[in-house]
Swiss-Prot record:
It comes from Klebsiella pneumoniae subsp. pneumoniae (strain ATCC 700721 / MGH 78578). The lineage of its organism: Bacteria, Pseudomonadati, Pseudomonadota, Gammaproteobacteria, Enterobacterales. This is Dihydroxy-acid dehydratase. [2Fe-2S] cluster binds at C122, C195. The active site is at S517. The gene is ilvD. Pathway: Amino-acid biosynthesis; L-isoleucine biosynthesis; L-isoleucine from 2-oxobutanoate: step 3/4; Amino-acid biosynthesis; L-valine biosynthesis; L-valine from pyruvate: step 3/4.
Amino acid sequence: MPKYRSATTTHGRNMAGARALWRATGMTDADFGKPIIAVVNSFTQFVPGHVHLRDLGKLVAEQIEAAGGVAKEFNTIAVDDGIAMGHGGMLYSLPSRELIADSVEYMVNAHCADAMVCISNCDKITPGMLMASLRLNIPVIFVSGGPMEAGKTKLSDKIIKLDLVDAMIQGADPKVSDEQSNQVERSACPTCGSCSGMFTANSMNCLTEALGLSQPGNGSLLATHADRKELFLNAGKRIVELTKRYYEQDDASALPRNIASKAAFENAMTLDIAMGGSTNTVLHLLAAAQEAEIDFTMSDIDKLSRKVPQLCKVAPSTQKYHMEDVHRAGGVLGILGELDRAGLLNREVKNVLGLTLPQTLEQYDVMVTQDDAVKKMFRAGPAGIRTTQAFSQDCRWDTLDDDRAEGCIRSLEHAYSKDGGLAVLYGNFAENGCIVKTAGVDDSILKFTGPAKVYESQDDAVEAILGGKVVEGDVVVIRYEGPKGGPGMQEMLYPTSFLKSMGLGKACALITDGRFSGGTSGLSIGHVSPEAASGGNIALIEDGDMIAIDIPNRSIQLQLSDAEIAARREAQEARGDQAWTPKNRQRQVSFALRAYASLATSADKGAVRDKSKLGG
């Protein structure tokens, strides 16, 4: 029988000092035999996805205490990728994932907490907490802040839906008037919550459902809706049950590594491909799998991407649907239900509610459930009122979207495409693979060949795009922006958005060893591995080299002979200490970022730290 971890600090005469300090936090004698549960919050006023989380930790804590546990809350950092985008701040985004994971480990292990409730929401916070949860392997439930309502405004006598990406594109488009750009900017992000499309934050919160670590509705129920409060209340109750199951009944099935098994990771990736999720999810799932000591690699993702269709298309791949529409169509369980009927899921997995996948679908899939309360929950909709308050409205759609032929979520027979929303490409400068979000690629450019325009920083590429130096047919190559080379693997949302602004969204390709925002669409290929700074062949590409992209055949090729590539590699190595570094880039890199770069691996490994360098 496992012993409560917290007993280390609450039992025995030698722990009198620790108990004295616990008493100073409000604990009494009656509390010293109870499980101590960490409420891991991420409230900050910097991030709209987290601005409403201040009081939600207290909600969870009250339920933990009522159920017989002791709740102790702490906070992690949270970086807003949208605000950090397009300047030096983006260097810090991905490294913050490791800091978040480490900070959770530090707090939980230093104080011997028995379990956790993780209150996350945005791009690197959910992955960081997920990595920590699987590293620590103590009972955990995730409950995120929820998606933002889609923005809406009237343009050309039509009401259109908006999000952050629209504001960026319109702001950079010289054909758009100042008045219209201002109107879109003021309408794009109307409420608290994670940005309203299938961007990285919402993709990851959906994947926690598929991994079994969060409750039904977590990924799609709006941040502003009153129904979301139940997820927080239930999380507080349920974590105490999970904790007692493990420590008092010796039931290891309550542990996250046994819930988020390899089968669950495969289901999560299957969901991601089917819903056209962010390419960043590949990075984060690979990293989380390593923390869980699961053999889940790019090869597994490649195999899944070849057989899973796209059943859901959401902004930024279309402006017709946002997360509020996914929820109305049944949310994550609606998509999983269609995948299950297509025979594409592992059915033996369980979730934090203790339900198997078939049991979960029977209760929560809107296409089969007989539960009116579940149907009511999935009719929770937007209010269209600007607010930063959680649970501030209770509007509902009159009906569910159960149209699986032409609705937001489709059945296998009516799939948006037989190929899924993500694909892994391989070639002679991406030997370990690269990722493209096919959900956002126009059919006309699934095969594309063009001359390279090479840039050794995102800033130089943006200047060239806005300066008219990139023209129709070009393949923009941005390198030395990987985990080590950036450092920090910047997102390239500005270059892709500006290509659209210049009318080149369907006329050019962009390739990088950096990554893309979940808001990116177009022929945008990222995560090229090995990265330039690690000796990858992307460092050998020169202006004018022809590059051939063939998504249907999962191929990407630099059209040079092996002999020419070898000669360029020899020339690069001859640079000595300057080999595999940018030639003409001025970038100030802090000590903290240099420390990150010294251990960073390429994207095909999840951009995690290289344990071998630490003797691990």
